[in-house]
Curated annotation (Swiss-Prot):
It is found in: Endoplasmic reticulum membrane. The chain crosses the membrane at residues 184-203. The keyword Transferase does not apply. The keyword Amino-acid biosynthesis does not apply. InterPro entries: Emp24-like, GOLD_dom. Its main location: endoplasmic reticulum. Residues 204-216 are cytoplasmic. Eca and bai are essential, though not redundant, for dorsoventral patterning of the embryo. Specifically required during early embryogenesis for the activity of maternal tkv, while the zygotic tkv is not affected. Involved in Golgi organization. This is Transmembrane emp24 domain-containing protein eca. SMART domains: EMP24_GP25L (SM01190). Residues 134-164 form a coiled coil. Residues 1-20 form the signal peptide.
Amino acid sequence: MRNQFICLALVLCTLHSACGLYFHISETERKCFIEEVPDETTVIVNYKVELYDPRSNGFMPSSPGIGMHVEVRDSDDKVILSRVYSSQGRMSFTSHTPGEHVICMYSNSTAWFNGAQLRVHLDIQVGEHAIDYANVAQKEKLTELQLRIRQLLDQVEQITKEQNYQRYREERFRHTSESTNSRVLWWSLAQTVVLVCMGFWQMRHLKSFFEAKKLV
């Protein structure tokens, strides 16, 4: 029983992601990230843009004139979010189809600063990691125990979504494998038919050649 509890705790602790990173781009460069998201799952993106200062050889908070255009596409390549934000912001969206969601970011400027380099700090939170439980507790006036139960229920719900998504991926992979195997089979049969026809044609051609030479 204790081992089962430990395993469940590990699953809950490692459950879907909150990733923090930073990257460098020029003002006209586009950067995209792929995040696998189950359906009906909230995703929150926090970012901050810093502008390179050659005088101090470091990065400073960017000019108010620089913003970030954020575009999000779902697994069907449908745009579900496209908007220009300021140099520091927070956005959220909810997935309606499971699969890979592409999050693209690029500066809204047109090289006003001669293509200056930008540093973008990015933090993507998915699932129950995207919920601000302190705010939830304050709004709904939950006790510490009620809040903990709420967190556990949300985690269980997220685990269910993850399991459903894994089943969806397995089904899609199986369908792709079956389709590939079917194509390979038909291609092999087509090659066999072509080889048989070529062999038959060559035999008839040789027979006609030998008959013309009166060798048979």
